[in-house]
């Protein structure tokens, strides 16, 4: 799913998604709010016009009425437009937030937080907002930028955080019971010239940079996302590189969808990694030695996959690799050629520690559009006003690679690009741009007519695209130590309601009657104040303790694996007072205090109050 934000995407973007088979949303236009004046009338008009313009494009599945929750009356007015202009398009209309199952909004989901529903699709409209420049790999790689969460991370740190944040949603995926999360979209999938929070002057949340060179998080998401619902295509990826200075000792992170990962250095086993967040395997305190680092993943069915890193030698030469469209470089004045520039060792392997300055010289029927780079040191205050190397003819490689753009002219002819650097063997490319027919100043064909469509994944499965791994257990009745009239709000598939106890220790419990003895193994809880508040609790099943501990803070739900047992009455008891301390204090654009509506901590004081928004009781699948 690609989510466009705030403004209706261009027709080119819509049609590109059609060609690639990418599901997208379509926003109308908003300034992140719910205005009560003429501005909302304009939004309605824009939704109408955009819907008419794009309703025949199959990639659009969601009409987005706002990048923020809107009133139910405003949502009804948007739904009226949908009913009039696209009643049979097979799409849904909704808005960010809009969690109430009684709303006319046909989908919803908060920014960042994990939402679940048994009815409408709820998906996170933005997750993992952290930023990292592609140039900053880790603390031990030039330019030796020290990791500084959350908006000045190193790429290694950002990749690890992306695994942790996606795991929040993956645990609640289809197959986990009746109430599920529909997933989430990674905000800022590419670095962009937009609102930023780090020490640069552009947004660096992308898993690829501004010229579409991959960072480690690109490959991390490939591991986690390759499948219809489950990550079921074997992948293993070692974050980073294996070219360090003597004496470096650091953790090695491997991302894999296997059941175990073993690490080998020059053929010798370094043991198996410590698994966390489903996909992350950590190998602590690995001492660098030159050679080959290999990770081997083993799957439940005995299959294996592996990934290998090799130590690079000293920088020796420049390598240029051009990328053009299927027709080559077309002399239409708009076509682009992307050229990768790498610094390689004498064996041709990229040197991941190289930051050599490359001098470019372009001749012929083309226009230099250049690339992008950090250009300053990691602590340089000029970053905020930097031109980022835009249009510069001297650019450094970053971690051994960069990319530049060259635009064609309207005249066909030879194009030559030379790249030189001190102490390195130079490189050049030579090609000719191709003429195109022009009639009355217009082109009779368009570039998209020549773009291939990759359908190698095959059709959407005709049957279920997942295998249930948990089963929801029905609740017949709920009683509580206090406020029993509201106890049902803890199990009503509505994240806008909650039950809370009265603040006395003896009344801080709630009990779910399962009607008959059931095999229970798992409890998924959305607790009031979940990102601020930890709850010391005891869970019993027919008076037998199946869990006792403190709930972790989260971005929505805590998943508690209980001692498997069979019983008919599950009770949750608060065993100590609660207190608030934000576990995600640097998340900008989220209210970091108790007033955040979706957290609800402002309405329920700390202390001896157990407060449950939703309790999902599950057992093994039948």
Indicate residue ranges for each PLM-predicted region.
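Beta-strand-rich structural segments
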Residues: 238, 252-255, 334-352, 416-419, ...
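Short beta-strand-plus-loop segments that form exposed binding edges in beta-rich domains
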Residues: 573-580, 602-604
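Short flexible loop/turn segments that cap and initiate beta-strands
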Residues: 249, 257, 263-270, 307-308, ...
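Substrate-binding/catalytic cleft of secreted carbohydrate-active enzymes
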Residues: 3-217, 221, 230-242, 282
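Short proline/glycine-enriched turn/loop motifs at strand-loop junctions of beta-rich domains
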Residues: 255-260, 353, 517-518, 531-534
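Short, hydrophobic beta-strand segments
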Residues: 283-288, 389-410
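Edge beta-strands of extracellular beta-sandwich domains
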Residues: 302-313, 425-435
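Disordered, acidic Ser/Thr/Pro-rich linker "stalks" and the adjacent N-terminal cap
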Residues: 450-517, 526-532, 536, 541, ...
């Amino acid at each position: 799913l690609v989510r466009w934000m705030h403004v209706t995407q261009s027709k080119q973007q819509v049609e590109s998604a059609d060609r690639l088979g990418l599901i997208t949303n379509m926003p109308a236009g908003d300034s992140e709010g719910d205005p009560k004046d003429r501005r909302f009338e304009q939004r309605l008009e824009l939704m109408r016009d955009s819907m008419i313009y794009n309703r025949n494009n199959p990639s659009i599945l969601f009409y987005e009425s706002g990048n923020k929750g809107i009133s139910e009356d405003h949502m009804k007015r948007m739904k009226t437009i949908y009913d009039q202009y696209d009643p049979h398009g097979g799409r849904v209309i909704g808005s960010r937030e809009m969690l109430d199952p009684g709303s006319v909004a046909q989908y919803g989901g908060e920014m960042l937080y994990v939402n679940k529903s048994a009815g409408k699709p709820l998906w996170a409209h933005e997750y993992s907002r952290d930023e990292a420049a592609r140039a900053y790999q880790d603390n031990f790689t030039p330019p030796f930028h020290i990791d500084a969460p959350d908006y000045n991370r190193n790429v290694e740190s950002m990749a690890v955080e992306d695994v942790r944040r996606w795991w929040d949603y993956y645990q609640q995926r289809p197959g986990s019971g009746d109430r599920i999360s529909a997933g989430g979209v990674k905000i800022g999938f590419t670095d962009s010239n937009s609102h930023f929070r780090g020490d640069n002057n552009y947004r660096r949340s992308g898993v690829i940079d501004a010229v579409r060179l991959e960072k480690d998080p690109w490959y991390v998401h490939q591991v986690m996302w390759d499948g219809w619902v489950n990550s079921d295509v074997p992948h293993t990826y070692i974050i980073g590189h294996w070219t360090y200075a003597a004496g470096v000792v650091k953790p090695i992170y491997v991302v894999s969808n296997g059941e175990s990962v073993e690490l080998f250095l020059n053929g010798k086993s370094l043991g198996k990694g410590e698994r966390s967040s489903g996909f992350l395997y950590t190998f602590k305190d690995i001492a660098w030695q030159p050679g080959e680092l290999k990770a081997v993943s083993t799957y439940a069915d005995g299959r294996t996959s592996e990934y290998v890193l090799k130590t690079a030698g000293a920088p020796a030469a420049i390598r240029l690799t051009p990328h053009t469209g299927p027709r080559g470089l077309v002399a239409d004045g708009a076509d682009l050629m992307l050229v990768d520039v790498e610094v390689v060792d004498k064996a041709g392997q990229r040197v991941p520690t190289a930051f050599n300055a490359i001098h470019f010289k372009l001749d012929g029927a083309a226009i230099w559009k250049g690339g992008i780079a950090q250009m300053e040191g990691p602590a340089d205050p000029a970053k905020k006003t930097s031109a980022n190397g835009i249009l510069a003819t001297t650019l450094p490689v970053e971690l051994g690679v960069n990319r530049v753009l060259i635009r064609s002219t309207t005249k066909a002819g030879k194009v030559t690009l030379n790249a030189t650097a001190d102490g390195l063997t130079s490189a050049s490319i030579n090609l000719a741009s191709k003429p195109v027919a022009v009639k009355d100043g217009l082109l009779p064909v368009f570039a998209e007519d020549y773009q291939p469509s990759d359908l190698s994944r095959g059709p959407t499965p005709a049957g279920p695209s997942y295998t249930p791994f948990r089963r929801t257990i029905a609740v017949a009745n709920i009683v509580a130590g206090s406020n029993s009239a509201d106890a049902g709000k803890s199990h009503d598939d509505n994240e806008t309601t909650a039950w809370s106890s009265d603040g006395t220790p003896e009344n801080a419990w709630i009990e779910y009657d399962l009607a008959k003895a059931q095999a229970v193994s798992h409890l998924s809880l959305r607790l009031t104040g979940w990102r601020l508040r930890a709850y010391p609790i005891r869970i019993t099943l027919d008076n037998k303790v199946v869990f006792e501990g403190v709930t972790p803070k989260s971005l929505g739900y805590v998943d508690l694996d209980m001692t498997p047992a069979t019983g008919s009455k599950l009770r949750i008891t608060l065993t100590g007072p609660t207190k608030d301390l934000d576990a995600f204090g640097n998340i900008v654009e989220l209210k970091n205090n108790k007033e955040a509506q979706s957290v609800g901590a402002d309405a329920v004081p700390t202390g001896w109050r157990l407060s449950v928004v939703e309790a999902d009781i599950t057992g093994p699948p039948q």
